[in-house]
Amino acid sequence: MKKLILSSVALVALAGSSIAADLPSQKAPPAVAPAPLWKGFYVGLNAGGTFGNNSAVNGTTWNTNGPSNAAVMASALLSGSGSGSSGNAGFIGGGQIGYNWQARYGGYNFVTGAEADIQGIAGSGSDASRWSATNTDYLGQPVSLLSNQKGNANLSYIGTVRGRLGILIMPTLLIYGTGGLAYGGVNANVQNTQFWITTGGANAGSNSVITGNSPYSSTQVGWAAGGGLEWMFMQNWSAKAEYLYYDLGNAAGTAVNSYIGTGGFSGNNGLQSVTNYTGRVSGNIVRAGVNYHFNFANVAPVIAKF
């Protein structure tokens, strides 16, 4: 009896093993491919420097009134022009927001996107120019005019709205080009000092000093273009180095210079001149930044367990 029971148990175990071997195997579900690393919204901060010739000023000065408010006729205008330029450098810092798309084409991974940024600028520029003009017939008296002009133009802020197109040279390293609209707050001022010298006639040797200045402020719109490198150094975080060139067009204004009463004439006798000026607002930006990528597509799914 005992032998019969043991034989039955062995037979059942053997049959169970055979049935289990015939059952289809259950494979683990295939791994889900990770969503594109760069796709999605991002925000960040940046800081760096700006430099260039965005303080170049060109001016033309002419006299509208002579002593005693006598109008200077067109045939007797004392006029002169000059120009100057200088470098302009300052610190720049601000933030950006953007969106990336990632696609594979021809065996390469491309990243396209759009970005908007705005930065404050701490810096200024100035230049000076000197010119002279002579006229042999001002109310019958030969006179000469020597002008010293100093101008400056600077940006208080600059922002851009740009497209970006890049290629991944490594899964975590992007090289890109960028370009689009730029805008900025331009502040300019011209200060002009003139020396009016009567070289002949009854008032020969009489000298006068004229001085004045004119401020200018506006929001200029232009373009910007450049490129950079961006490195995804950890999940959702990237660092970038970027260069941009910007051109916001011309800033223009008029300075009215009034007699201040020195030299051969006394009191405010109406001696006056006008300076028109223009200055090109352009320059370079070199900056570094850090971005946080929201990358919602890469959020791990929640799997219920029972």
Describe each PLM feature range:
Residues 2-306:
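Gram-negative outer-membrane beta-barrel domains
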